Amino acid sequence: MARGKKTQETGSSKRRSKVQEEEEHVEGSEEEVEEPEQKSSKRGSRKTTNSTSNKKKSVKKVESDDDDEDDLSELDVVVEDDNPVETSDNDEVATTPQQEKSSRSRKNRGDHESHDDNSDNEEQGDRGNRREHKPRPKVDPNTPIGKLATDQILQFLQERGEESFNPQLKHGARQLLNQLLGKYNGQRYGSKRGGPPRGSFGQRGGFNSRGRGMPPRMRQGDTRDTRDTRDTRLRFNTTQSNRRELNDQSDDLYND
């Protein structure tokens, strides 16, 4: 019998525990339902506070706009006071200090631009004068040669070469005239710089048998006597037995 009582007691305790768990579950669900309600109420309160703050801001904006309008009206009055007024004494327009400053700045700009234009025109005029070549007066062919200077004689020869289509006379007289007047540039035997891109093709130009040629002293050729070379060739190409005869023949040739 004792065993049966224990089983009944355990069954009743299990039932009680289940009932307690269900009650706790129901209470937890109620709490969960209450939490979103509280959140929604908080959101509503926030919205109401935001709406009230927006209303306050709008009221402030309206007030600030009114203040700005008042300020603008004051500014308009000031500007109207600063507008130019025609005076009856001098019949001139009275300007404000700001307008005077702006007019001065405009005048200064105009003067500066006009000065620049004048300077540009002067530079162009100088360039034009530099490019202009004043021709020398022609020499009268009827004047005696004793009364002509050297440059006049050379100029006359140059003119005669142009008229007679003689380029040698024309260019020769012109070169002599330029040399006499100090306008002659001597012949240049090559430049010292390299080719178009630096370092390519070695050292092109200068005194290295390329470009405009070698200097004149290096182009003189062999200065030795050709007769000596001819004698040496004959001597080395023959035998010793015939040397005396060849020497006699060469002496006879030189004596002749």
Swiss-Prot record:
Region (Disordered): 1-171, 185-256
Ranges of biased composition (kind: Basic and acidic residues): 108-129, 219-234
Recorded coiled-coil stretches: 14-39
UniProt keyword annotations, A-Z: Coiled coil
Lineage top rank: taxon: Viruses
Acidic residues composition-biased segments: 21-35, 64-92
Biased composition (Gly residues): 192-205
Protein name: Uncharacterized protein R561
Organism: Acanthamoeba polyphaga mimivirus (APMV)
Phylogenetic classification of the source organism: Viruses, Varidnaviria, Bamfordvirae, Nucleocytoviricota, Megaviricetes
